[in-house]
Amino acid sequence: DYIPEIQGFKDITLEMLLNMCSGLDCDGFMKVANIYFSTDLKKLINDYHIDRDPGKEYEYQNVNTLLLCMAIERAIGTDISVFLEKEVWQKAGMSYDATWSVDSKQHNQVKGFCGINAAPIDLAKFGSIYLHDGYYNGNQIIPRQWVRESFCKYNKLKDKDGYYYSYSWRITNANAFVAVGFLGQY
């Protein structure tokens, strides 16, 4: 409902996108490369289609996070990087500005799937927010309930590296969490 111009995805929920179980076909390195190097991500989205029942099978795919970012931007009425700056970066008192890559100057779609370019100290602060139920320096930055739900092992199946996946985090057997991206990005 948030992105009506994209056809064929009406059975996919925001929670499915968060948990990488949308059923979208994204197999192969070429699709990964195409989404990363695309200069028009909104147009590229229409090349994807559902090939499995949404909500049934976990498979990490960048397109899930891209769609999630696009839906969030529609819901909040602003660029997700502006929202992150105001609601997290400023409230937590991060040490340095961060940037988020976009597909092109012409289309300016945030590449939500390939992370935030931030200083290590600020990434550590972000991790600390999650370690402390959404609090940093006594301030509630992220709702406690959201943080707790993030670690509920939504997907009962592990990926090839032995992680569960829940709300954009990888969860280990030791009840630890980590953000690991494509080809070992952290």
State the predicted function of each range:
Residues 1, 17, 45, 58-88, ...:
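Alpha-helical scaffold elements that line and support the substrate/ligand-binding pocket
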Residues 34-50, 54:
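Amphipathic alpha-helical interface segments
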Residues 28-29, 73-85, 134-142:
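Structural helix-adjacent loops and short alpha-helical linkers that scaffold large soluble proteins
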Residues 95-96, 101, 147-186:
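Active-site Gly/Thr loop motif
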Residues 128, 136-151:
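A conserved catalytic-loop motif detector
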Residues 8-12, 36-38, 51, 117, ...:
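Extracellular/periplasmic catalytic domains that process cell-envelope and extracellular macromolecules
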Residues 6-8, 53-60, 109-117, 178-185:
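Solvent-exposed loop and edge beta-strand segments that line ligand/cofactor-binding
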Residues 1-22, 47-49, 76-113, 118:
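Active-site helix/loop module of the DD-peptidase/beta-lactamase fold
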